[in-house]
């Protein structure tokens, strides 16, 4: 399966090593970063969503206006916008950037944060609502006539989208490690998205999600978000990692705590992973996870382009065929990953797929 390689697009150019105030909204920076990801071979960028963040639908449209081949993975919370309207919004965006839109359905880990937008459902209720929401989205994208719906969470008559996605649907990404999340993922998601982990950890995650999907006859794809430290030599890469740790430590007072992380099952895994040591497996580095107490999705692969490609192939062999790859320098690392790692990883995946195809029995 071809590998999907994505980046992350913020509403300003910042990171733990280059912090700017969260309130800074930088349209020129958004356009610059979108164009960089577009030029350096990324498939999509994740455009995040939270109660205090700028509207990401508007940002996604701005990305579309400033790129030619880049797609977006749009984080979206069910319930704030009715699914009928959201389906039309996503289909419209997908027609503006033909076939390059994915929607990452997120339910939020923190009740307090969702209450800031007037949503007082519990986490379990939000997962239950997500099931119905995704079902309505897909009917809106595929049904050729208006339809009525009366469910637990949504009710409408004559729902219809005259505009349809370019490829008939919009891929649905979903994540979460709680039992309720795995239940939704198994039945509904096209791609299961998760935080950084070791190969052994991801093998466990893949197994759990596949078990949840099996009763529905489904086989979702898997995406992992992981940080990258890349250099010409192994020694230089680890020296750079040490410099990053020092820079983040110096900036800790400028970084907002991720209070929602303490309630998220995925971040609990991150904290447990951080407690296991500084370096794990081939080149997995916990330095920033440890520094931030497991509240940051900052598991990192450190090494040369060849070492990093080999490490990512271990994940590919474990079932992960999509990644969000990002470094710590918000500009230079986008370029370095796109120039030195992405072509190498795509070539290795193509070679592996060709080898597998050659060993499969010929069709009768």
Language model: regions and residue ranges:
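An alpha-helical appendage that flanks or caps ligand/catalytic pockets
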Residues: 2-11, 117, 123-166, 197-316, ...
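Acidic-and-aromatic substrate-binding clefts and catalytic sites of carbohydrate-active enzymes
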Residues: 47-56, 79-84, 198-204, 230-231, ...
């Amino acid at each position: 399966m071809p590998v999907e390689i994505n980046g992350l697009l913020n509403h300003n150019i910042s990171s733990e090593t280059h912090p700017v105030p969260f309130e800074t909204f930088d349209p020129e920076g958004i356009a610059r970063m979108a164009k960089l990801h577009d030029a350096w071979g990324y498939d999509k960028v994740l455009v995040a969503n939270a109660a205090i963040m700028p509207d990401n639908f508007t940002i996604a449209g701005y990305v579309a206006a400033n790129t030619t081949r880049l797609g977006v993975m749009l984080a979206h919370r069910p319930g704030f916008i009715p699914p009928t309207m959201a389906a039309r919004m996503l289909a419209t965006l997908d027609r503006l950037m033909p076939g390059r839109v994915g929607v990452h359905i997120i339910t939020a880990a923190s009740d307090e944060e969702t209450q800031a937008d007037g949503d007082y459902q519990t986490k379990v209720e939000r997962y239950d609502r997500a099931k119905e929401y995704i079902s309505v989205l897909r009917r809106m994208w595929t049904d050729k006539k208006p339809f009525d719906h009366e469910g637990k969470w949504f009710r409408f008559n004559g729902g219809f989208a005259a505009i349809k996605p370019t490829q008939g649907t919009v891929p649905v990404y979903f994540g979460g490690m709680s039992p309720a999340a795995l239940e939704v993922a198994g039945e509904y998601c096209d791609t299961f998205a998760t935080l950084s982990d070791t190969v052994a950890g991801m093998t466990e995650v893949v197994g759990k999600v596949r078990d949840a999907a099996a009763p529905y006859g489904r086989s979702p794809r898997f995406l992992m978000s992981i940080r990258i430290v890349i250099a010409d030599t192994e020694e230089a890469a680890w020296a750079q990692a040490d410099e990053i740790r020092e820079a983040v430590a110096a900036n800790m007072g400028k970084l907002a705590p991720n209070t929602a992380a303490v309630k998220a099952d995925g971040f609990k895994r991150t904290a447990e992973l951080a407690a296991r040591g500084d370096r794990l497996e081939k080149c997995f580095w916990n330095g920033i996870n440890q520094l931030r107490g497991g509240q940051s999705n900052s598991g990192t692969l450190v090494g040369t382009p060849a070492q990093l490609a080999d490490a990512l192939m271990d994940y590919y062999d474990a079932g992960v065929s999509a990644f969000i790859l990002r470094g710590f320098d918000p500009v230079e690392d986008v370029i370095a990953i796109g120039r030195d790692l992405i072509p190498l990883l795509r070539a290795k995946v193509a070679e592996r797929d060709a080898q597998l195809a050659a060993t499969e029995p010929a069709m009768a």
